Each structure stands twice: as C-alpha cells, then as structure tokens.
Amino acid sequence: MAMRWSCWRRGCSWRPTAVGSPRRERPGCVEPLGTRAASDTRAQIPYFSLMKILMSASPTMHSISQFHQRTPAMCSCRQTQSGEKYSDPFKLGWRDLKGLYEDIRKELHISTRELKDMSEYYFDGKGKAFRPIIVVLMARACNIHHNNAREMQASQRSIALVAEMIHTATLVHDDVIDDASSRRGKHTVNKIWGEKKAVLAGDLILSAASVALARIGNTAVVSMLAQVIEDLVRGEFLQLGSKENENERFAHYLEKTFKKTASLIANSCKAVSVLGCPDPVVHEIAYQYGKNVGIAFQLIDDVLDFTSCSDQMGKPTSADLKLGIATGPVLFACQQFPEMNAMIMRRFSLPGDVDRARQYVLQSDGVQQTTYLAQQYCHKAVREIRKLRPSTERDALIQLSESVLTRDK
C-alpha cells in the first residue's frame, strides 16, 4: 500500500521535467488508473478505494461550497520563474483568431438561405472559442520550441477553424440526440428548425470542415482529425450504455469523456505541432497536454451541472441526469450512497429519481472528488507543456489549465 501510494504521489506531483520521450498511456486514463505490466504481482487497488485514500489524505481538498476557490496546489502555476504573471491566454490567443467566425462562415459556401441560417447559427462570436484558443497557442509554442519562429503558419490557423467547426457540428447533433431546447442562452437549432433539418445542418458543417482540412494537404493531419470524428461517434455510443461493475463503470465514463471531448483537443494540438515541428517528442507533448486539459474540462463541466444555475450555464442544469447519464459526481456519490446503483442501472427513469440522485450528489463528496480528479489531469497537462522551451504562449497554456479549474460556465 505504501509503495503504491508513493508511486501515485510521484505520478501526480507538479514539477517541470526535461524534454524526453513521454510514456504512452491509454486514452482517457491518468497514471493512478492505469494497469501495470503483467509481471507486476503486487495487489491492484480498485480505483474507488484508491481515490478514497487519496481524498482523505489530501490537504488540498475543498468543501462543496469552496471547490472553485484557488488553493496553493491549484495555483502553483500562476507565475513564471521570473515572478511575472502569465499572459491572459484568451487575449493572447485572439491575436491570431481575428475574423475567426467570418472565416468559418466563408467556408460554409451556402446558397440556400434557410440552410445558411441554420449552419451559421452558433458561429455568432458569442462562444468561448476554447478550442481555437488552445490550438493557436499550442502552434506558436511548438514553433518557438522548434526554431524560435514567432510567426504562425496559415495551415496551423486553419486547424483552429476546423476544430471549432467540428465542435459546433457535434453540438448541433448532440442537441438532436438529447432533444435539447436551449444552448448558450438561446433556442437550439432543432428547437427552431426541427430535428431533420438540424441533422443536415450538422452534416453540412462537418463536410465543410473536411474540405478545409483537405486543403491543408497533409495526410497525417487529415488522419488525426478523421480519428476525432470517429471518436465522437464512438463516444456517443458509449454514453448510451452503462456498466454494472463500479470500476468498469468509471473506466467507461473516462473513455467516453476522452472520445467525446478530449480527442478533438488532443489531436488538434498534435496536428499543429506536426505542421510546425518535425520532432515526434514535441508531437506527443502537444497531444498529452490537449488530452489532459480536455478531460479536465469535461470533468469540470460535469461538476457545473450540479453547482451552477441554468442562467450561468446557458443551458438547463441536471441535464445529464434527465438524460439518464451518470457522470463523475454521480459515480463518486454512489460510493457513499449504494442505493444509487439501481438508479444508475435504470438510467434515472422512475419518477423522483433525478431529484433524489441530485440530492445524493450534493450530500456526498462527489463534487469535490470529481474536481480533485480534474486537478490531477491539469497537473499532468502542465508537466507536459513545461517540457517545451519557455515562451509567452507556453506560459499562457499553463494559465489556461488553471482557468479550466476555476471556470463557472
């Protein structure tokens, strides 16, 4: 037990490391979740048991009402070695994203008025543009690391557009699958134009993204983004299923989280690194940063479903419970309230299930444990990106990982 705890602590400590060949991990898994080689005969600690030990031993855990408050552990990345605060990643990223949504609308090339209105509905400049911001910052950080180049290539900026288009297409399709009526504080495409037309609008955005991607002319990059689209579909199928065993259930949840959210960020980061730097070590650093930030982003999103109001989120809260989906806070809460198992297996389908499950989550430490897990993913992301040569953009990516943990919508 002591040896395993020591290994886990070494795996999660937050400190810079030299550039080297990063260890490959299974998508969607952090080090304490991974299985060891077959030759390792030491007893395996079930994931939830290990997390229970960690949560009781960690001095940086928060109460439910304080989980978004910054702690020394969370904020050790806030300053550079020179003592200066990091640049605002969003302001820095927008230097390369001026005209982003206008450029996307040009890519759509639509003559039919109704289809044009549907396809452009979410490209109104009111989104967070989280993915394009990460992509352009990663592009510059990798370019500087490679040859101190200060300029970003047009092909790298195109990846930012493609990433936002793929993401938006999935929002349109997800809203159809979930029968959602609001997003970003306004009616969904399917609510206004109907499900059939919404599906076609999402398809059109995906096809336009594919054309823009093909113009880049790099087969490796095309393959990476094609993998994203496959992951998105497989992730949606995973979300439709459930597992009876609690450890399988959590692994299932993390795999779904990787495929539905983190794969796009990870592969987009890797794509711009490939376009700007020939070193495969840098490609892996970019991928691992994007993967870990992406998983953390979704974990916090799942937390906000229980802790934010609908006005803040721009969409209904407790939405996942209403759809029969058990996210991190629910799975952790189930450890304290085993009666939730039956609710999870029947996908909260009986009258009163959603309200009872929500109360169980808020009475448990499910929110804190999910937030703590998100912290660990962000720590891993920071350790990866610190392997690159120091730059304003690299530091902004570190700051961005903190903003993932402290966001409220």
Curated annotation (Swiss-Prot):
The protein's name in its UniProt record: All trans-polyprenyl-diphosphate synthase PDSS1
Annotated cofactor note: Binds 2 Mg(2+) ions per subunit.
Pathway(s) the chain acts in: Cofactor biosynthesis; ubiquinone biosynthesis
Record's keyword annotation contains Nucleotide-binding: no
Protein's organism: Mus musculus
Cited function: Heterotetrameric enzyme that catalyzes the condensation of farnesyl diphosphate (FPP), which acts as a primer, and isopentenyl diphosphate (IPP) to produce prenyl diphosphates of varying chain lengths and participates in the determination of the side chain of ubiquinone. Supplies nona and decaprenyl diphosphate, the precursors for the side chain of the isoprenoid quinones ubiquinone-9 (Q9)and ubiquinone-10 (Q10) respectively. The enzyme adds isopentenyl diphosphate molecules sequentially to farnesyl diphosphate with trans stereochemistry.
Cofactor(s) this protein cannot do without: Mg(2+)
GO molecular function: all-trans-decaprenyl-diphosphate synthase activity; metal ion binding; protein heterodimerization activity
Single Gene Ontology BP annotation: isoprenoid biosynthetic process
Lineage summary: Eukaryota, Metazoa, Chordata, Craniata, Vertebrata
